[in-house]
Amino acid sequence: MTNSPVKIGINPISWSNDDLPSLGGETPLSTALSEGKAIGYRGFELNGKFPKTPEGVRAVLAEYGLELVSGWYSSLLAHRSVEEEIEAIAPHCRLLAENGAKVLVYGEVAGSIQGRRIALGERPRFYTDEAWKSYGDKLTRLARFTQSQGLRLAYHHHMGAYVQAPEDIDRAMAATGEEVGLLFDAGHCYLGGGDPLAVLRKHLARVCHVHCKDVRAGVVKLSRNEQWSFPECIVNGTFTVPGDGDIDFEAILATLLTAGYRGWLVVEAEQDPAVAPSYAYAKKGFATLNSLLARLAPQHASA
């Protein structure tokens, strides 16, 4: 429904992976946008192929009748000052806010190994209470700035980064103020060692954005046994779209809807389009979420 407070969007990573150009790097943005629109998605998150100005993004999305969901921001806050980060993030805030986005996808990439072929166990960590407190204080201050720009900071817990495991999410939420929202990503939660539903219920009050990434449990087990890097997890098929993996998205959506969640459900599942064809898998992800919405809350589903 057009005015529904819950909308289904998608990330172009289903067609083209910015970090691994061998996975669909040749696919133009126009293909993703036209196919996503045809499937029924209401909006897209940004990727590296979008224009870099508010006006450019607006024009591209308008051509397809799509909304801007949000866009990833690579932060180095763990290694630099709040003032430096505010200066760096301001243009991204402007681009998002001027195109109607309400949340900013925040990724902490300081020290991250997410793009490197290094075992995930070698990721960066905060080892002391003081380190967590310092980081949390800085993050809260940065979130107040994004809030002043009309955007809720949505912290993306992510493999290969400081906040990866369920206990990291606990520490991050405890160390920050309510200004810092949580981007709940079911796939990263599972691969990071968590029970997605339990983590969601624990931090439900802070969730302001949702990435609907499914996993293939057998591949997850193999990734742990073989100590894969994050890129190896991707190319070997760890992730997939809702309805094609082992995460219970019905329980996740029911929990969100019961709590009155208002925002986007974003299909964001990086895999090799040569193995998992982009259109077919994007369609399956949409159909899964839309059918769940139709059953759980018919007013939110697309006709």
Locations of regions flagged by a protein language model:
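Acidic (Asp/Glu)-rich catalytic clusters
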Residues: 2-5, 33-38, 51-70, 87-101, ...
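Acidic/histidine-rich catalytic cores of soluble enzymes
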Residues: 44, 136-246, 296-303
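Active-site beta-loop-alpha junctions enriched in small/polar residues
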Residues: 13-15, 47-49, 73-77, 109-111, ...
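Active-site acidic/histidine proton-transfer and metal-coordination neighborhood
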Residues: 82-184
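Active-site mouth loops of central-metabolism enzymes
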Residues: 14-27, 76-85, 124-131, 240-243
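Short, flexible, mixed-charge acidic loops at enzyme active sites
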Residues: 23-27, 110-121, 219-232
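Structural preference for beta-strand elements that scaffold enzyme active sites
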Residues: 5-9, 43, 67-70, 102-105, ...
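Conserved, mostly hydrophobic/aromatic
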Residues: 10, 36, 44, 61, ...
